[in-house]
Structure formats: structure tokens, C-alpha cells
């Protein structure tokens, strides 16, 4: 699923080096920043590595950025890979044996590691040792390699898919939450200076409140609205040009786009608001289940338009009102069922 409001990374998101380098520059996630600052200072005061850290939550909220910040704060090298890229245990062994003391190894989509690779990680995380097999058949022997004290940082949008043994080995688990409008305005104002964009306060607010609580989306929208302003001969990005650009991009007043409307209208039109299973929705919309669960549903749930119930997805009365559709008679019964299961 590719669209302007997708929180997933895209090549176009890397236009300028706008990532903050240190905790004091990072906007939002205040509790996480404060706790990380304490943990990092404590580790440095003891001359120890930082405990292995797990960032989880919706995409686009700063998990990779925070991992790089930790690397800068503790003064180690930053090594990055992803779960799908590590196909064999030997691939991970090669990465681990090239680490140095205080290095940060960042594994994105860590929930997609296969079992054989995970088993290599367990002793590496707990004891900083790597057990490898040399040779084949009767001549094969196990060799134990001591690893330097490093920090593993995992990132996942699907915490429930992480195995319990792996999850339990992270000493610092942290959930990243959606941003509010004021926090996104700060992100946009900082970026506007780096992009050399004359962004007014009203323009910043208009973009922020329609960015789905996600910095990555806010920055992407800012770049596109800058394009509309330039072509229209505008020297600044204000509320008027922001609203114009967002309408052209089919982003409505609460940050929904055509994909969200397709999703909501399918449930409303064909299932009277639900409940309906996610597999049915995915098949009907010709989308992957993972794409719906990671890209569309989190924000709809966050703003109260969608509920996940034991019987399936149910859109709320607020969703019907936003769609300007009549509310089916049985809707109140669906929501009562949901509330009873809470």
C-alpha cells in the first residue's frame, strides 16, 4: 500500500539530514526521552554498556532515530540491519563478530527474525558469547567466541509477533505513542528551518493536525506542500496553501485519505458497520492484512473510528457520522457487545 499518508519509510523521505542527533533535539515522547537519559547516564557512570532496548509502536514515530541517538549518546558505532535481511544464523554471526565495545546493533522489524537466528541471539544478548559450529559431520566441533559488550536495539510495529524468549531479553522495553498537534508543530518548525521553508504558525498547525499523529507523515506533507507553494508562486507556507495542498493530496480535515475511506465504507456498506474479520476486509480491498493492520487501522483506532472486537472489526458511530452515512439500527448492539468484552 503506497500513499502520501503511509507511515512506512520511502526513499523520498531521506531528502535532507533532518534527524536529530541527541536526545535534547528530539521532539515528543517525553517520558521515553527522560528515562533514556537516566539509563544512558547510569550506564556511562558505571562504564557499562546500555541494556538491550526494544522500541515498539506504530511506524513513523522515531524508533530508528532514537536508536541512532542512543549510539551518539553512548559514543559507539551504529550498525543497522533488519529482521528480513538476516536469512541465516551465519549472517547474524558475521555481524556480531564485527562489533566493537559499546557499539549499537539496530535490528528493524525484529519480529521477522527466524527461529534459528533468534537462538544465536540469546547467548549473545545474555552472556555476550557466540556459539558457532566449525566443520561438518563427525569432525564438527562447537567453538565459543566472546563478544564485546554491545547494545542491541530492536524495533517492531508488531510486539505480539515477537517470541516471548526474545522479548524477555530486552531490559528496556519502550512503547512509542502517536504525537499530538503541538508536538508535530515543533517537528515541522524544526524541519522548515532545515528545508529553508517560510512556514507560518497557521500553516504548521494545518499540516500537523492532518498528519495522523506521525512525524514521518508530517514531514512528507510539508515537502509536498512546499512544492504546491513554489509552483503557485507563494513565498511562504501558510494555512491557505497548506489547506489547498492537502486537498489536492486528498487528505481530509482529520488526516484520512482515500484508502481510509475505502476501508470504512466497505465495513459500513457491506456489513452495516461490522463486525467483520480482517481477512475478509483484506480480500475485498485487495490489500495485505499486514498493510491494513500497520498502516490504516492504528490511526482509525486512535481517533475513535474503529474498534477491534473478539468478533471482528467494528466501525463506530463517529465513523458513520464522519462518512455522513445513516447509522444502522443494530449499531448500538454491536458497541454494547464490544464494551462487555472490554
From Swiss-Prot:
Its main location: cytoplasm. The keyword rRNA processing does not apply. SUPFAM superfamilies: P-loop containing nucleoside triphosphate hydrolases, Winged helix' DNA-binding domain. Pfam families: AAA_lid_4, RuvB_C, RuvB_N. Keywords: ATP-binding, Cytoplasm, DNA damage, DNA recombination, DNA repair, DNA-binding, Hydrolase, Nucleotide-binding. GO terms for cellular component: cytoplasm; Holliday junction resolvase complex. Its EC number is 3.6.4.-. It comes from Rickettsia akari (strain Hartford). It is found in: Cytoplasm. GO terms for biological process: DNA recombination; DNA repair. DNA binds at residues 289, 308, 313. It catalyses: ATP + H2O = ADP + phosphate + H(+). Residues 180-250 are annotated as: Small ATPAse domain (RuvB-S). The keyword Cell wall biogenesis/degradation does not apply. This is Holliday junction branch migration complex subunit RuvB. The RuvA-RuvB-RuvC complex processes Holliday junction (HJ) DNA during genetic recombination and DNA repair, while the RuvA-RuvB complex plays an important role in the rescue of blocked DNA replication forks via replication fork reversal (RFR). RuvA specifically binds to HJ cruciform DNA, conferring on it an open structure. The RuvB hexamer acts as an ATP-dependent pump, pulling dsDNA into and through the RuvAB complex. RuvB forms 2 homohexamers on either side of HJ DNA bound by 1 or 2 RuvA tetramers; 4 subunits per hexamer contact DNA at a time. Belongs to the RuvB family. Has 3 domains, the large (RuvB-L) and small ATPase (RuvB-S) domains and the C-terminal head (RuvB-H) domain. The head domain binds DNA, while the ATPase domains jointly bind ATP, ADP or are empty depending on the state of the subunit in the translocation cycle. During a single DNA translocation step the structure of each domain remains the same, but their relative positions change. The lineage of its organism: Bacteria, Pseudomonadati, Pseudomonadota, Alphaproteobacteria, Rickettsiales. Residues 1-179 are annotated as: Large ATPase domain (RuvB-L). Residues 253-342 are annotated as: Head domain (RuvB-H). ATP binds at residues 18-19, 60, 63-65, 126-128, 169, 179, 216. GO terms for molecular function: ATP binding; ATP hydrolysis activity; four-way junction DNA binding; four-way junction helicase activity. Mg(2+) binds at residue 64. Homohexamer. Forms an RuvA(8)-RuvB(12)-Holliday junction (HJ) complex. HJ DNA is sandwiched between 2 RuvA tetramers; dsDNA enters through RuvA and exits via RuvB. An RuvB hexamer assembles on each DNA strand where it exits the tetramer. Each RuvB hexamer is contacted by two RuvA subunits (via domain III) on 2 adjacent RuvB subunits; this complex drives branch migration. In the full resolvosome a probable DNA-RuvA(4)-RuvB(12)-RuvC(2) complex forms which resolves the HJ. It is an enzyme of class 3 (hydrolase).
Amino acid at each position: 500500500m503506497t500513499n502520501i499518508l503511509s507511515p512506512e519509510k520511502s526513499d523520498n523521505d531521506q531528502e535532507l539530514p533532518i534527524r536529530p542527533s541527541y536526545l535534547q533535539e528530539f521532539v515528543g515522547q517525553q517520558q521515553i526521552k527522560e528515562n533514556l537519559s537516566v539509563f544512558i547516564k547510569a550506564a556511562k557512570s558505571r562504564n557499562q554498556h546500555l541494556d538491550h532496548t526494544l522500541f515498539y509502536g506504530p511506524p513513523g514515530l522515531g524508533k530508528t532515530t532514537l536508536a541512532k541517538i542512543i549510539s551518539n549518546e553512548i559514543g559507539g558505532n551504529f550498525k543497522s540491519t533488519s529482521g528480513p535481511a538476516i536469512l541465516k544464523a551465519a549472517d547474524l554471526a558475521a555481524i556480531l563478530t564485527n562489533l566493537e565495545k559499546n557499539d549499537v546493533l539496530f535490528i528493524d522489524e525484529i519480529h521477522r527474525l527466524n527461529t534459528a537466528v533468534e537462538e544465536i541471539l540469546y547467548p549473545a544478548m545474555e552472556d555476550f558469547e557466540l556459539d558457532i559450529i566449525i566443520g561438518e559431520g563427525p569432525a564438527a566441533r562447537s567453538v565459543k567466541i566472546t563478544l564485546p559488550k554491545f547494545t542491541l536495539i530492536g524495533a517492531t510495529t508488531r510486539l505480539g509477533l515477537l517470541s516471548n524468549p526474545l522479548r524477555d531479553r530486552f531490559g528496556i522495553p519502550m512503547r512509542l505513542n502517536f504525537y499530538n498537534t503541538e508536538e508535530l508543530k515543533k517537528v515541522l518548525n524544526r524541519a522548515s528551518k532545515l528545508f529553508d521553508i517560510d512556514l507560518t504558525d497557521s500553516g504548521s498547525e494545518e499540516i500537523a493536525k492532518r498528519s495522523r499523529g506521525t512525524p514521518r507523515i508530517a514531514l512528507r506533507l510539508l515537502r509536498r506542500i512546499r512544492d504546491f507553494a513554489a509552483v503557485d508562486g507563494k513565498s511562504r507556507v501558510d494555512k491557505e496553501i497548506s489547506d489547498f495542498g492537502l486537498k489536492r493530496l486528498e487528505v481530509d480535515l482529520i488526516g484520512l485519505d482515500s484508502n481510509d475511506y475505502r476501508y470504512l465504507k466497505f465495513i459500513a456498506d457491506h456489513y452495516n458497520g461490522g463486525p467483520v474479520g480482517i481477512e475478509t476486509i483484506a480480500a475485498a480491498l485487495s490489500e495485505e492484512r499486514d498493510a491494513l493492520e500497520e498502516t490504516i487501522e492504528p490511526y482509525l483506532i486512535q481517533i475513535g473510528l474503529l474498534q477491534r472486537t473478539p468478533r471482528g472489526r467494528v466501525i463506530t458511530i463517529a465513523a458513520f457520522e464522519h462518512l455522513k452515512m445513516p447509522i444502522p439500527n443494530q449499531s448500538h448492539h454491536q458497541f454494547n457487545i464490544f464494551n462487555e468484552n472490554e
